C-alpha cells in the first residue's frame, strides 16, 4: 500500500474516558481489509527483528494482533488478562494508566521464563501497560 499512514485510519475522541485524555479507536483500521493487511505485514516485519519465542496478547485487543503474528512467525501466543479473569494460580502485575491504575494477570503455569516474549497491545499511549 503506497504512502501508508496508519494515523489516517485511527479515529480520535478527545476528553474520553475523562477530560484531557484522547481515546484512539483502531476500529476503522480493522474494518478496511487493505489497511489491516498492510498493518499486519508491517507488524510482522517489525516483530521478526526480535526473533520471538512467543507472543503475549494484552487483554483484549492485543489478542487481535498476537495470534496472526504468532502464526506468521511460527510461534505460540499466550493471553495476558485483566485481573480477576483467570482461575487458579496467576502471576499479576500492576501498571499505571493515564487515568488510574490496573492489573494484568497470566496463568503461573505459562512457561515464559528465559524466552523472548513480544507483547502485543492495541496501541501505545503512555507505555503504562508495558512498563
Locate predicted features.
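PRPP-associated nucleotide enzymes
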Residues: 1-131
